[in-house]
Design a protein with these regions (language model features):
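Flexible "arm" and connector segments at domain edges
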Residues: 1-71, 75-123
Length: 123
């Protein structure tokens, strides 16, 4: 089951609103937008804390488990935010993957910035 389908099932099971679109004027339900955005911010903070704890103690199994749990929670609430407003994040993620895989130089090798970030290729 794709993550978007899981997000929609969760919203349905728990009586959470699902809008079919965002209007041309922006988010059409400010209460829903603010709630979902607050959840993403909360989970992002928890994820970053777990990442710092794992960085400080990379061999600690509890830190590893907590990092994975917080990463999953963050992804879940981002999917919830998108599902609530009718966005298909699975399709968007497929497009990002395809775009990222095209980031090769003319020689077929990745191009890196000094800090290690992969840069877009000529195509």
């Amino acid at each position: 089951m794709k993550l978007l389908e899981q997000a929609r099932k969760f919203r349905e099971a728990f009586g959470q609103e699902v809008l079919e679109c965002v209007s041309r004027y922006g988010f059409i339900n400010s209460r829903l937008y603010q709630m979902q955005t607050a959840l993403v911010a909360e989970e992002a903070t928890e994820f970053l804390k777990a990442a710092d704890e794992l960085y400080a103690d990379p061999e600690n199994d509890k830190c590893k488990e907590n990092f994975l749990k917080e990463a999953s929670d963050l992804v879940f609430v981002v999917y919830q935010h998108c599902a609530a407003h009718g966005f298909d994040l699975d399709t968007a993620m497929d497009r990002v993957f395809e775009s990222n895989m095209s980031k090769l130089g003319e020689d077929g090798k990745p191009i890196y910035r000094k800090d290690g970030k992969v840069l877009k290729g000529p195509g």
